[in-house]
């Protein structure tokens, strides 16, 4: 963040756009070693426990954002992922899960794996009205579509498409606190 103090510009935080175990880690270490910065704004590629484990307490108070919803669906997805040995909170994991589920549901709704049929059915299976489908309920959603019912797939990220076919994004703000990333809000 850049701010003005009196009439002088000061830079308090360093924005780090990189990857956890690659160049981004080196930028943080060099900044800490030189004393240039002590708080970091982290891109989604820098969010993960390994960076906190590698840097340690010096990363405390640093923050960033990444895609993700704060909802019952995202909590359920996190539980399902953990039960299957995965980190459901990692960047783009929920979005990838939802994309695959929506494609499967759109194929079922259209009765075809043709790309135009999938495109025509994405919003139909992802928007209200319909029976709400959450993470872990893909089979149920497929059964409801086969029975001719309308569904509203919400998934891990509360998917909703607008009239132009665009999905509204959800983002989480995270901060390093107590040796781990904690979600402090939604953007």
Residue ranges and their predicted role:
Residues 1, 7-8, 12-187:
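Extracytosolic ligand-binding ectodomains
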């Amino acid at each position: 963040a850049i701010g003005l103090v009196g009439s002088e510009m000061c830079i308090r935080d360093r924005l780090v756009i990189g990857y956890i175990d690659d160049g981004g880690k080196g930028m943080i270490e060099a900044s800490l070693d030189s004393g240039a910065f002590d708080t970091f704004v982290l891109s989604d590629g820098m969010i993960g426990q390994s960076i906190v484990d590698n840097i340690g307490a010096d990363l405390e108070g640093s923050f960033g954002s990444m895609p993700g919803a704060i909802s019952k669906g995202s909590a359920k997805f996190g539980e399902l992922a953990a039960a299957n040995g995965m980190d459901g909170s990692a960047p783009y994991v929920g979005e990838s899960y939802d994309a695959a589920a929506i494609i499967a549901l759109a194929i079922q709704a259209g009765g075809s794996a043709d790309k135009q049929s999938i495109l025509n059915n994405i919003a139909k299976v992802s928007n209200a009205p319909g029976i709400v489908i959450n993470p872990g309920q893909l089979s149920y959603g497929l059964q409801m579509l086969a029975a001719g019912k309308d569904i509203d797939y919400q998934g891990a990220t509360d998917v909703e498409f607008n009239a132009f076919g665009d999905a509204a994004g959800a983002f989480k703000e995270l901060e390093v606190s107590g040796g781990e990333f904690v979600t402090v809000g939604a953007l």
